[in-house]
Amino acid sequence: MASPPHLPLLLLLLVVVCNAAGGDGARVNPFTAKAAFIRYWNRRVPNNRPHPAFFVAKLSPLQAADAASFAAALPRLLPPLCARAALLCPSASDTETAASLAVGGGGGGGPFKGYSNANFTNYGSGGVGGADGFSAYSPDLNVVGDSFRRYGRDSTRRVDTFASYEAEGNVVTANFTSYAGAATGGSGSFSAYAADTNVPDSTFTNYDAEANGRRREFTSYSQEANHGSNTFAGYGKNGNGLRETFTTYGNDSNVIASGFTNYGESGNGATDTFTAYGKEGNVPDNTFRSYGAGGNAGVDTFKGYRSESNVGDDSFASYAKGANGNAAEFQNYGGSFNPGTVTFKGYGEGSNPNHHIGFKEYAGSNNSFKGYAKSGVDFKEYHNTSSADAATTMSLEAVSSGHQHLKWSPEPGKFFRETELVSGNTMPMPDIKDKMPPRAFLPRDIAKKIPFKPNAVSEVFGVPLDTAMGKAVTSTVAECERAPSRGETKRCATSAEDIVDFAVEMLGNDIVVRSTASTAGSGGQIRLGNVTGVDGGKVTRSVSCHQSLFPYLVYYCHSVPKVRVYEADIMAADSDQKINHGVAICHLDTSDWSPTHGAFIALGGKPGEVEVCHWIFEGDMTWTVAD
């Protein structure tokens, strides 16, 4: 009996696609978006090279039928698309928890040990005596949008604690409004707000406002956060007899824009201590407006503003302005390791001379200090040095105190010289782990139906532009629309097909893509085994692609001239065990790089004077002409 006319073709298709994912050894269903892309790759890059597992793992998991139906019905079918296509979409609200809390609100219903991704109104309001405890609110979630309104308002002699709010989240939008407002007596603590978050957008409004006789401690706000913005408005405003401590705000953070407004404003008989703001931050943009303004008979202490930070832009406006009978002390402002632009406006100003204020140290470069009371203010030290002098002084201080490597500075091994890429060399390996939330590519048929504009993405994915995710979308689009640097050719790829097209356009169709095989060895010492230069170690051109934060995978790809690419076996530092296979790229022309680039901080030298090498991190990739 003769075979149906299309059967041989179908069998051939099955054989081709099942062998197509050669890099990971997995068989691919031919009726999937993944298989469709592999067929596309084979047409565009017909060199029969294996498809690397790291790239195949990023492909859409959608079935072909799903890909077709979703492409025709966005945004109506968004929820099932998010689930089936492995996208980064806003987390669904915990409606069951929200309902149970609504029943138990208004002074009871606690303590609560866990709460995830819902809006909360009135916790412990009007409570008398006893204690409230809240252990964890939305920990370790992706694309969180939470609001918490009124905690312990109008309570009396109540002890309340809040242990953790939005810790370790990805793309977190957190809004906390009113904590212990108008409360009398009692005490409380807030231990951690948005700690270890990635791309946060956090707001805290009114902490102990109009409270009476309270003792309060806020331990940590946005500690070790990465790339985002935070605001805190109103701490102890109009309070009476408050003893308040704020321990850390934005310390050890990376590229964070933060604002703190009104600390202890118009307080009576308050004892306030703020221990550290923006310490060891990297490229911070900090604004602090109003500390102890209009206070009466208060004792205010501020210890440390942007100490040991790296560049950035900071301003502090108004300290103890218009205060009466205050004793205020400010210790250490602007003592940065690498100076940024720092301004301080208004210290102890006002018509009432009945105060005593001490300022122990104001240091750094590009600083300005404007407006302070002509009497009752004692300055211990004021330094306005050049950038070079300040950097030298801070470097010597760091060495003498044993701090060879500050948290903000480039991680050991993040940048290195080409001469270090030799077999047998022992060197530090940076943390190359992918910090982005997991996502997959959208099939091109779906991606091209979503205009690459913030408003369109917001509408399709239900992401308000004033949230952390919305701001990330806006930032990604803006970076993609930015004009390229001199010698750079760039493109933002919204699908896997787009990446292949750009690489072929730049390098031809006989190409390969590489990335470091795993994260083994990250953050420790390694030894290099066999080191091989790609294309014989010749100076070449590559296409490097870096992830951008978006609901689906979007890559910023750019063609980089004058590079050498290396592959290296990565061995355990103390044995002959191979633990990884690394890919490194050396940029030979750095003349257009910024003088403040972390590479020059780590290696010395200036733009154009030294080459800079780095590993290809997990999640990123580099394309070159095939050997």
UniProtKB/Swiss-Prot annotation:
Its tissue distribution reads: Expressed in stems, leaves, shoot and panicles.
Q: Which residues form the signal peptide?
A: 1-25
**Residue stretches spanning the membrane:** none
Name the Pfam families on file.
Answer: BURP
Sites carrying a glycan are 119, 175, 251, 366, 384, 530
Instruction: Tell me yes or no: is Magnesium among this UniProt entry's keywords.
Output: no
Superkingdom of this protein's organism: Eukaryota
Keywords attached to this Swiss-Prot or TrEMBL record, sorted alphabetically, are: Glycoprotein, Signal
Q: Does the keyword Signal apply?
A: yes
Task: Please report the stretch or stretches of sequence annotated as the BURP domain.
Answer: 415-626
Q: Note the InterPro entries from the entry.
A: BURP_dom, PG-associated_BURP
State the protein's name. BURP domain-containing protein 12
UniProt organism field:
Oryza sativa subsp. japonica (Rice)
> Lineage from the top down?
Eukaryota, Viridiplantae, Streptophyta, Embryophyta, Tracheophyta
